[in-house]
Amino acid sequence: VGNADQDHAEWCAPEDQSDASRQVYQTSNGASDIAAEYAAALAVNYINFGNAEDLSYAKALYEFSIKYNKTAEDGIGEFYRSYDYYDDQAWAAGWLYLATKDNTYKTFLNTFMNASNQGKSGSSGCQWGVYSPMSWNNVSLGSAILQGEITGNASDWSKVTTYLNQKCNSESTYYCEDSWGSCRYNAAMQMAALATSK
């Protein structure tokens, strides 16, 4: 939703922008990445608040995501594209497993994560298992954290802790993944480290 060029040109609340019109996109056969992200969010909401409708929609969105296996990359503008959907589907599967204890979701999460560590490539040629800070484009680190929490296997946790130690093991420098939005990446890495250490 929105126009990134317009949004970046004005530094104010969206409702105060001079032209507050918003573009909205819809699909009936794609956007697996976005559908899975919403499925994950609704599953978390169900875990926190117990609203059965949230869980019902989370399951439906997850099924939609699995059915079409396409990213929303085409047609939504040039900003904040997600170049794959497997990481989002694994993220949703992890949260749906925690919400339902249905092993179907656990199996998908484990299948994705095991494939990612064997160098599976997605439709865009991205290398799975190469973690990065949580962002609109990649939530595989979060999926790996969920896998470690769900399985409790030391080998699953070691993948996460090895990555975090390689990136964040410095007391004298500011971690900077990318110069554009460096604080958000730093905060995302801190969140991942906190979630891993709990």
Residue ranges and their predicted role:
Residues 1-198:
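Glycan-recognition and catalytic cores of secretory/periplasmic carbohydrate-active enzymes
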